[in-house]
């Protein structure tokens, strides 16, 4: 019945991943603007974005877009493992994608945002907390200490300097899972990944009390579920139909289950199908969207501290819309600088760092996978 599969439309680099990542990053800025302004011209509001109101609190743009980021990441990072020559090659690509931009934004927050917005300028550079934040990249994957001395303490969203970075540690855990599965030859038996995805969805559907005893655990299982769904879409793309009829079914199920208040039951699977359908929709003229550069990671890194800074100086004069527009323009400028002077130059080092590739060459990557899957990465820009 469904002859066309995802494998047929996912060949090569003509896809819309770059556009989708940029869109999701922009929507996170939009969503956060409502959280930054819980009072608007003296009137108390609930801080929910329009999608939160439409769904009666079942979903908001911020959380939804973060989940979609992990969904795309699961697909692309699995492809990255499959195309890597070794564990060292894979680790090098992941490290060069994540850490250069992260290190620079931490320096930016510590030495630009901090002194500009602190109430303790005289002692700011003498406090250990200042430099503990600077070295977030060394310990932040295990413990997030997202505050600087006296910075943003009177903001409506107090203390948090860069609240978006909480996803970094979960992203790194997911990368480790992809590598572990590869080293254990799990991708030769993709049913294991499918079973893991089903288990994670069952845990989320079950609303088990222990999952909500820890916000960190709940956040991890949520993002991890979407990442594994992305892995499943990658490994089973030869079997999953690419069908407009199934797209309509997915969209209709989202609408119906939203209306009856049970959106969580269909959201992960329906979202996965819809997002990947759009990602490989050739008729959308978006395949060259990132030709000027891949600015989505820069938007992710810089948006939160820029929004906090704007609120710090101009809160009485801002609305969620004006905050979104101002923050987007400033953050986009920083993202362009980050791409051209930090991320892109560091990504050119992928062919270097032979010491890491050599030390970990005894863990094969591509050779451990079925030959049919050993293709080049499909994203037009690095993931």
What are these model-predicted stretches?
Residues 82-89, 186-187, 234-246, 280-291, ...:
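Membrane-interface junctions at the ends of membrane-embedded or membrane-associated helices
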Residues 252-344:
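Alpha-helical transmembrane segments of multi-pass integral membrane proteins
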Residues 75-82, 174, 178-186, 226-238, ...:
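Hydrophobic transmembrane alpha-helices
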Residues 2-6, 62-96, 101-124, 306, ...:
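Juxtamembrane transmembrane-helix termini
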Residues 1-9, 241, 307-383:
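C-terminal "closing" transmembrane helix and its immediate cytosolic amphipathic cap
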Residues 15-80, 99-101, 299-304:
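Functionally critical transmembrane alpha-helices in membrane proteins and complexes, commonly lining
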């Amino acid at each position: 019945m469904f002859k066309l599969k995802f494998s047929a439309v996912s060949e090569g680099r003509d896809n819309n991943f770059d556009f989708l990542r940029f869109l999701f990053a922009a929507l996170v800025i939009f969503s956060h603007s409502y959280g930054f302004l819980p009072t608007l011209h003296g009137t108390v509001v609930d801080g929910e974005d329009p999608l939160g109101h439409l769904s009666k609190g079942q979903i908001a743009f911020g959380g939804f877009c973060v989940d979609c980021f992990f969904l795309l990441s699961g697909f692309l990072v699995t492809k990255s493992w499959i195309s890597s020559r070794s564990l060292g090659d894979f680790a090098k690509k992941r490290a060069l994608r994540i850490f250069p931009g992260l290190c620079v934004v931490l320096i930016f927050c510590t030495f630009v945002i901090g002194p500009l917005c602190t109430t303790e300028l005289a002692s700011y550079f003498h406090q250990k907390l200042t430099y503990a934040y600077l070295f977030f990249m060394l310990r932040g994957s295990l413990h997030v200490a997202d505050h600087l001395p006296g910075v943003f303490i009177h903001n409506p969203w107090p203390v948090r300097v860069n609240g978006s970075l909480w996803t970094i540690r979960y992203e790194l855990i997911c990368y480790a899972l992809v590598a572990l599965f590869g080293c254990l030859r799990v991708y030769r038996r993709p049913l294991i990944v499918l079973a893991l995805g089903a288990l994670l969805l069952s845990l989320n559907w079950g609303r088990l009390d222990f999952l909500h005893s820890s916000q960190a655990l709940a956040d991890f299982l949520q993002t991890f579920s979407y990442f594994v769904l992305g892995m499943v879409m990658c490994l089973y793309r030869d079997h999953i139909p690419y069908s407009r009829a199934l797209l309509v079914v997915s969209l209709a199920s989202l609408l119906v289950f939203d209306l009856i208040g049970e959106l969580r039951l269909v959201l992960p699977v329906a979202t996965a199908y819809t997002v990947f359908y759009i990602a490989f929709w050739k008729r959308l003229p978006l395949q060259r969207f990132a030709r000027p550069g891949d600015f989505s990671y820069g938007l992710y890194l810089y948006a939160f501290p820029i929004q906090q800074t704007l609120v710090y100086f101009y809160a009485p004069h801002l609305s969620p819309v004006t905050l979104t527009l101002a923050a987007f323009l400033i953050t986009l400028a920083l993202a362009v600088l980050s791409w051209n002077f930090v991320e892109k130059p560091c990504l050119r080092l992928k062919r270097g760092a032979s010491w890491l590739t050599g030390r970990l060459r005894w863990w094969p990557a591509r050779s451990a996978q079925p030959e049919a899957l050993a293709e080049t990465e499909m994203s037009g820009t690095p993931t």
